[in-house]
Amino acid sequence: MAWPWRRRRWRWRRRRPRWRRWRRRRTWRRRPRRAVRRRRVRRRGRGWRRLYRRYRRRRGRRTYKKKPVLTQWQPTVRRRCFIIGYMPLIICGENLTSKNYASHADDFVKDGPFGGGMTTMQFSLRILYDEFLRFLNIWTHSNQDLDLARYHGFKLTLYRHPTVDFIVIIRNSPPFEDTELTGPNTHPGMLMLRHKKILVPSLRTRPSRRHKITVRIGPPKLFEDKWYSQTDICDVILATVYATACDLQYPFGSPLTENYCISFQVLGSAYNNLISNTLNPNEEQQDIKSAIYNNVNAYLTRITESHMANLISKAPPKQVLKSSDGSLQTDHNDTQFGGNPYNTNQFTTTTVNKIIQGAQNYLTTIKTHLQPNNSAINPNTQWHLEYHAGIYSAPFLSAGRLNPEIKGLYTDITYNPMMDKGTGNKIWCDSLTKADMKYTEGRSKYLIENLPLWAAVWGYLDYCTKTSGDAAFHYNYRVTLISPYTSPMLFNPQDPTKGFVPYSLNFGLGKMPGGKGYVPLRMRANWYPYFFHQQKVLEAIGMSGPFTYRSDEKKAVLTSRYKFKFTWGGNPVSHQVVRNPCKGTGGASASRKPRSVQVTDPKYNTPEITTHTWDIRRGWFGKRFIDRVQQQQASPELLADPPKRPRKEIKGLTEADQEAEKDSGLRLRQVQPWMSSQETQSEQESAPEEQTVEQQLRNQLHTQQLLGFQLRSLMYQVQQTHRNSFIHPLLLPRA
């Protein structure tokens, strides 16, 4: 009989699952032991050891230096407040990928797509209060009677779209300005090359993952953690968000297309000297006839019949006959063999004059039907801009030609985005009154060069509109391109400054952008290429770049949730509210209704009009407090008009700001006392003709105003520094 304590113990073993195969057991790898740097010792022989000096043992407790206690004044009342809300960072309508959503967030669109596929958005306390007025966020605590504030950062949660991918970049370091390179750097192909970016893949691109991405952003880099007045930090830019829609599954072209090259049309050389919309056609009638109307091959399009059926006469039908040697006869009207179906003998005499007269009749009819009568339309001087028979009408610029080998008044361009190196590319805007297509320093505006075309056109219209301050910019300017990376090249080696004017396919077909066939009467009287009819070309060029979203959905939205953390502080006076206990608000459930938080506009929550504990003496307001409140202006209670541009949009340098900077630099350079007489003499010699006395007085007045503004700004900064509430100027938006 074996003793039970000597029996071999049963050892537990892991068994194979009954209906599954063996799987390797996951073992957590232990972190390697940190190597200890040992002291190098001297080896001695046996029987020898190192002698140590004997020290007397100290009695008592060791004393340490006292740490200095740094104290900072804190307000009596401190309340933590979270501002939580939801906001669409991007709402991208169909075929609006290259537009800036932040610039069009407050638009009123009756019909058609809305928004844009990119955004450059900023956050500030004023913007958060504006969102509160729109019932888009909540404040967990009121800021009423608490005039101080501290900012601690925010959390941004991005929710993934089912089918559309996005790229987001968040910045909290200045400068916070929109420049000519902001749009190109927001292109998906450029953002994918950035180191610090946030990819928001769609549920289709990356399934079985969390449906949201959370990011923690701290205060701005130049922002000090201390108490500020809410008025001072009301306009401080807390963070900026740059986002764009993209395609992470098919970055280099959709699988539904044959290739990633695009084609568009540009005006031919016949329009080089006829591009101005203020051209008098009666004075330049001979040039217009010889360049446009007398060109018989220009009428060989599929739209000529619908536009000029009653203005142009056809030749009698002739057959293509073959001679005995197999050659074709030269006198025929079959366009497949280079013929012309129209009566070519009458073009220089009867037909051209009939077309011009028809254009004048159309303008007279348009002027009659416009109520009230529009005196700006003159049929005698604007007949060349008429919709049906003008020099930019569909019979001359439509892409569908009866014989593609017979060239018209335009040029077909093919663009390969993968061949674009950027060097030599130029894009700029010219006024419609400019008489040529050349780049002229001073007259040509908003130049972007040495960038790929697919990046240069990204957000270009919104940048130009923002910088110019003209809401009708797309009606007053045209876009001109230079690019040696197209086929044929949009570059003239004999004249490197000459540009080319592109136009959309719908404009060439006589349609509105988007393909609508009805053209308003006012546009029929002024039918010529400008930015409004060039947007789709720039959209197509931008969408040809890598990682670009190609408008597969009617509307794509990037939804976000933000949570800003503030601390309100102050020394308010306790208000005792006494209600009538005998008069209720109606019903037993009145106290169960949710109470709304009273939020005050941070712009007017100033220390000057806020009541503090030290403003009351023996139950009465002090004289200083009464005088201080009387000097302040009352806050407007009436509803103000909405801002001209969205507040969430990042501001840019306007033309006035750029000119002011140039003038300030020039004038400061002129008044520098350390400049040598030789430099001053050289500048005077290079200056233009002598200015008049009136111009000199105006320049001196402008210089004095500029110096006064700079001195006032300096004194304000000194005062803010003395109050320990100085804010770095780069964190403030431009006025």
Curated annotation (Swiss-Prot):
What is an example of a Pfam family matching this protein?
A: TT_ORF1
Q: Where is the composition biased (Basic and acidic residues)?
A: 649-666
Q: Where in the cell is it found?
A: Virion
Q: Does the keyword Transit peptide apply?
A: no
**Region entry Disordered, spans:** 577-604, 632-695
Q: Which UniProt keywords apply?
A: Capsid protein, T=1 icosahedral capsid protein, Virion
Coiled-coil ranges (or none)? none
TM regions (residue ranges) = none
Q: Which domain of life is it from?
A: Viruses
- The answer to whether UniProt assigns keyword Chloroplast to this entry is no
- Amino acid composition bias (Low complexity), ranges on this chain: 676-685
What the entry lists under InterPro entries is as follows: TTvirus_Unk
List GO terms (cellular component aspect).
Answer: T=1 icosahedral viral capsid
Name assigned to this protein: Capsid protein
Q: What organism is the protein native to?
A: Torque teno virus (isolate Chimpanzee/Japan/Pt-TTV6/2000)
